[in-house]
Amino acid sequence: MGPLKGLKIIEMAGIGPGPFCGMVLADLGAEIIRVDRASAIGTGSKQDASNRGKRSIAVDLKSEKGVEVVLKLVETADAIFEGFRPGVMERLGLGPDICSERNERIVFGRMTGWGQEGPLANAAGHDINYISLTGALAAIGRPGSPPVPPLNLIGDFGGGGMLSLIHISEPTRPLYISYAV
């Protein structure tokens, strides 16, 4: 139940904002299918709270068969989102152009640290970097003392709230959203 009931969304497994975004979308009623790398199975926590409410599959994304499995999911999905560095989905054969060929209504969401272009686009993005460079870290802690890194991922969690996926209603062409945390 929830306002997103009836939406089918593919989460390309990653760290930080991706799993959180999928968790929130699932909490709001969306059907989330998490696509894990086959090599990652058994390496994470079995009690990862961000996986609640999701179904998941393990796929070898570097094989043609694995890519085809994901593209079959894309054919009936409302949205897909990922948080990889620029160009990764394209190299895998799962970029927005290919996904929209399979499903013209697909919403393709990207969450990266620094966006798809610019001087930091290919740099790994981590929450502490975002909140430091934006000045948010300076607001955390006691007056007159050095900043205190937060115990949660403020930037990532904020970025994880990609509820723009609701704009699925009637797009005239595939919708592509790129969100730099």
Where are these regions (language model features)?
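Active-site-adjacent "lid/gating" segments in soluble enzymes
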Residues: V24, L28, E90-S169, R173
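N-terminal Rossmann-fold NAD(P) dinucleotide-binding loop
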Residues: G18-P19
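Helix N-cap at the beta1-alpha1 junction of Rossmann-like dinucleotide-binding domains, i.e.
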Residues: A38-I41
